[in-house]
């Protein structure tokens, strides 16, 4: 195990540094798919939980086109995954690729008229997977299902992928939200 990998595993790097290292490893693998060091760095970052204070809360829409008949949350829950297929939006794609193991994904539906959203389930990202077949990323998620959904402030979560820092979530969410996450 290299010194770099040991530092990654010990939590010595910031979230930004981890994402930069991951991007660099991917760039090296494009040039040389057998680069063992790049493979090892990418694998460790894709499977190692970020430190608690670096976690992000990702409020994730699950109804393509806001159409309830196209909802995919049940598939996510049963398969232990989270996917994203709106690659035409480069900002959301970038946000989806910033998700790391240890982050919390929360399924949500916007209620624009009230300035709220309904949240249904949450899960801890356990691994990030870049599919060589589809050239798309998906997440392995350990989903939890609270007994009831909850209405919370919208917090600007108007897109499919809405990452929020711990500080923002602490500032905006009611105390009941933290009970719901248990």
PLM-predicted stretches and their roles:
Residues 9-19, 26-39:
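Charged, low-complexity interaction regions
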Residues 18, 25, 45, 105, ...:
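Hydrophobic beta-strand residues in large extracellular and virion-surface proteins
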Residues 94-112:
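Short coil-to-beta transition motif at edge beta-strands of beta-rich domains
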């Amino acid at each position: 195990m290299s010194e770099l990998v040991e530092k990654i595993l010990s939590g010595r790097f910031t979230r930004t540094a981890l994402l930069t290292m991951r991007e660099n490893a991917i760039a090296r693998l494009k040039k040389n798919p057998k680069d063992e060091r790049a493979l090892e760095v990418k694998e460790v970052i894709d499977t190692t939980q970020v430190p608690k204070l670096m976690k992000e809360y990702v409020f994730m829409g699950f109804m393509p086109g806001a159409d309830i008949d196209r909802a995919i949350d049940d598939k996510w829950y049963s398969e232990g995954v989270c996917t994203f297929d709106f690659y035409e939006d480069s900002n959301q794609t970038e946000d989806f690729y910033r998700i790391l193991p240890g982050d919390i994904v929360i399924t949500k539906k916007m209620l624009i008229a009230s300035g709220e959203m309904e949240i249904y389930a949450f899960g801890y990202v356990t691994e990030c997977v870049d599919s060589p077949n589809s050239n798309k990323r998906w997440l392995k998620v350990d989903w939890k299902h609270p007994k009831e959904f909850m209405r919370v402030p919208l917090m600007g979560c108007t897109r499919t992928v809405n990452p929020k820092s711990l500080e923002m979530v602490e500032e905006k969410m009611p105390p009941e939200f933290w009970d719901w996450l248990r």
